């Protein structure tokens, strides 16, 4: 053993000539000896050529530039906490006949596949459990990935919120994800979870949260057991959980999170997580979005963050874009670049006011966007109306969303067995026609999340911070960011990759949302830089890009929104015409009914005849009869 270890002593290591001129720090052999394993660790942590520690956690990351590594989004495949997964499988799913859950989940999937559909609260106990079996995993992964992005941008040491509010239709999904990110020792001052819908969802939240260590009440940190005792306790606990399959008496479960059914109006929170909560009625867009975002911003504490999660479809993106527009007011700052915190006007119309006057509207409330936007100018993809995407001409409209892979736990795999939720696939690629079938394609145990998100940060309201914001705005220190700019060359304004990079032999093409406020297309070739080319081939959608490129051009022309406004007016006109025709037919049927009742003998009563006619003409006929 010792012979093998000492075969890699420093004097036997040959250095390249390019390193001989470097002033390497003097390394002592004792620094590399592990006294427990009696061996030698040549490099105990990943270091660069000067033996300085880096952010890399493996050899692949070590090859990347430090800026590239800093701009990467969370890479690991997401996976639900095994204890939570086991509790869902044993204590929630096990009490139902599987096909009953599949049938309810199938109906809900069909419902949300309709154009511009929205998530809604669960109405029955069966819908509650079907939601957990089908939708919970998607929401968990979307929130987890968004919170990891927030944690990376503000720094792990600065991401320790003490007052948290989670609002959603699920079993406190945001709290579950936050607990997994910050670990078992995370015990903040306040955690509120607002669960809208059927009261049974709160009972399910108790079961799920009780499987996380940081939800245990009255833990005694002083009397810490030995490692062997902890291992024994853990095995006994797992054995007991494996034995118990069925319903749980939730009244005896105590957790740290406060479960609520109403949204607070007076408290302040350091972190607010909103999952599908800005719009509940598609016909109320955008008024309802404005009202809801205003309410939640009013309870956001100085220095706090608000995380908005929506579906990764056109409706979800337009909700996000509207919340961004009403908060940042980019139309009032046409000449401003960078991420100078913007004054929140609380719904007051400020069009036409000068920048100096805007600070007086709300002198101590300023907001800036953390992610995913690298700028605070008008969103280049926003069209302002989700209905535009339903037109034939609107199918080519692009929108901003992100994807992430998450491993399916046992309950999710079991749910999607059988014919109800099986996905047909033909295996037409290559010579794979023999693989034609249904179910989980190739037996894969993961699914792809599809979501849109937005993260705001409220600035502190101390005097020094407010003076600094005013100074930055008055001096306009950032100037103008042209096409191809990296902004201030920090992660605050690096361009973000919004489509999967196109990787070809010798070059990589990337679509970026850039600090210039435009969509740009950058091309990185091997001849430009081997290191940057290597990093570009490792990039993914959702990353920040921190290096230059060989070619940088504007990627998308200005949207012709006027054309879609005209199409939308024609669509509304056609809908009104159809409604008038339907009402006219109902009127004619009613008149015929009156005539027949006056001159003919019928075996049906008036009410029965009207009821029969209503089956042909719908509610419009009954409404007309009531008006009559």
UniProtKB/Swiss-Prot annotation:
<dbReference type="GO" id="GO:0003735">
    <property type="term" value="F:structural constituent of ribosome"/>
</dbReference>
<dbReference type="InterPro" id="IPR015324">
    <property type="entry name" value="Ribosomal_Rsm22-like"/>
</dbReference>
<keyword id="KW-0411">Iron-sulfur</keyword>
<dbReference type="GO" id="GO:0046872">
    <property type="term" value="F:metal ion binding"/>
</dbReference>
<dbReference type="GO" id="GO:0005739">
    <property type="term" value="C:mitochondrion"/>
</dbReference>
<dbReference type="InterPro" id="IPR029063">
    <property type="entry name" value="SAM-dependent_MTases_sf"/>
</dbReference>
<dbReference type="GO" id="GO:0008168">
    <property type="term" value="F:methyltransferase activity"/>
</dbReference>
<comment type="function">
    <text>Mitochondrial ribosome (mitoribosome) assembly factor. Binds at the interface of the head and body domains of the mitochondrial small ribosomal subunit (mt-SSU), occluding the mRNA channel and preventing compaction of the head domain towards the body. Probable inactive methyltransferase: retains the characteristic folding and ability to bind S-adenosyl-L-methionine, but it probably lost its methyltransferase activity.</text>
</comment>
<protein>
    <recommendedName>
        <fullName>Ribosome assembly protein RSM22, mitochondrial</fullName>
    </recommendedName>
</protein>
<keyword id="KW-0479">Metal-binding</keyword>
<comment type="subunit">
    <text>Associates with the mitochondrial ribosome (mitoribosome). Only transiently interacts with the mitoribosome.</text>
</comment>
<dbReference type="InterPro" id="IPR016522">
    <property type="entry name" value="RSM22_mit_bud"/>
</dbReference>
<dbReference type="InterPro" id="IPR052571">
    <property type="entry name" value="Mt_RNA_Methyltransferase"/>
</dbReference>
<feature type="binding site">
    <location>
        <position position="373"/>
    </location>
    <ligand>
        <name>[4Fe-4S] cluster</name>
    </ligand>
</feature>
<feature type="binding site">
    <location>
        <position position="400"/>
    </location>
    <ligand>
        <name>[4Fe-4S] cluster</name>
    </ligand>
</feature>
<feature type="binding site">
    <location>
        <position position="379"/>
    </location>
    <ligand>
        <name>[4Fe-4S] cluster</name>
    </ligand>
</feature>
<dbReference type="GO" id="GO:0051539">
    <property type="term" value="F:4 iron, 4 sulfur cluster binding"/>
</dbReference>
<dbReference type="Pfam" id="PF09243">
    <property type="entry name" value="Rsm22"/>
</dbReference>
<dbReference type="GO" id="GO:0180026">
    <property type="term" value="P:mitochondrial small ribosomal subunit assembly"/>
</dbReference>
<feature type="binding site">
    <location>
        <position position="513"/>
    </location>
    <ligand>
        <name>[4Fe-4S] cluster</name>
    </ligand>
</feature>
<keyword id="KW-0496">Mitochondrion</keyword>
<feature type="transit peptide" description="Mitochondrion">
    <location>
        <begin position="1"/>
        <end position="15"/>
    </location>
</feature>
<dbReference type="GO" id="GO:0005763">
    <property type="term" value="C:mitochondrial small ribosomal subunit"/>
</dbReference>
<dbReference type="GO" id="GO:0032543">
    <property type="term" value="P:mitochondrial translation"/>
</dbReference>
<keyword id="KW-0809">Transit peptide</keyword>
<comment type="similarity">
    <text>Belongs to the methyltransferase superfamily. Rsm22 family.</text>
</comment>
<keyword id="KW-0408">Iron</keyword>
